[in-house]
Structure formats: C-alpha cells, structure tokens
Amino acid sequence: MNNFNDYEHVVIDGFGTLYDKNFIPLEGASRLLDVISDKGILFSNMGSISGLQLKDRLNGKFEFLPRKVITSLDILCRFLISENIKTIYHYGGKRADRTLRNITRIVNSIDKPVNALVFTSLPDDNWIKESQAILRYIYRHRDAKMILANPDRLLPGKHVGLNVGMMFDMLSQNWPRQEFNLSKIEIGIRSI
C-alpha cells in the first residue's frame, strides 16, 4: 500500500468506494480508513444530507471514520452564504429542506422571482409536479440561476433509475438562449 505519510490529506469518495447504497462497508474499507487515519477526508456528492448526518449514519458501521466528512450539501450551504443568496426555490427532499431553511428563505411559490433554483436530490414525493413547477418558473421569469448540489449522473453498479443530476439536465436544457437567461452552477466534487 502507498505511504500515506507523504500526503497532507487523502480525499476519498464514499458510495462505491467505502460503502454500498445501504451504507454497509465494502471489503477493505475499514482497513483503508485505519491506514489513512487522521489524514482522511470523506467527500460525498450527496445533496440530501450534511457531512454530520452522513457521519452519524456511518458511526458504528466502521471501526474508524475519517476525521472530516463533507457532502455537496455542506458545500452548497457555504456557497449560498458566500454568494449572499437569500431566497431559493428548492427542488429536493425534506431533509435537505430543513438544512437549507437554517441559512436561506425557501419560497414555495413560483410566482415571485428568487435568487436561485436549487436542486439537491429528487423530491420525496410529487417529483413530477415539482418538475413542472421548475419549468413554469423558467418560462414565467425567463431568468434563473440554477444550482445543482449533486452533480452525479451515472452511478457505479446496477442502474438505480433517475437521479437529480439527470432531472437538472432535462429541466435546464433546450431553452432558446435569446429568450431565456439561465446560468447553471454545479456544486460537488469540482468544488473541493
């Protein structure tokens, strides 16, 4: 195994690297975390939970955990604060919604303009209705900053169906540029 002492930090992905979709450790994952010890930083593109919430889920399943656990939701929150984004329309689940409400105002109506349309995960329910609301918002306001907080499109292993990255692409593409001013920002692995 490489000498990890030569590195200041070792950033590793979670899903498919350390654990499966049920957060069960993969073979060799605990040993790897032991070897990299306090240099380890777990980064997950999850837009639905924070690093603290992910660490809680993993606690007790691994003998050792990285000293730091970060998710795309954590990076999104920092981005919203640093960019002074005060109002958003949120396309995502209730867990992310609760976290985002601590730092910004979430608007439930598409009638008034917001600072950004934020995509964190697939909505818990009524995702077709939520998708239609995004399309109506774009059509009505003609101007939107769209932020994707989970840029994964393809996942390793067996196909699991639609994900929020695919929905973001479907909802944000093919608008005539001369009529619609859409800016797209992806937050995740590229942002660390």
Regions found by a protein language model. Give the residues of each.
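HAD-like aspartate-dependent phosphatase fold
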Residues: 1-192
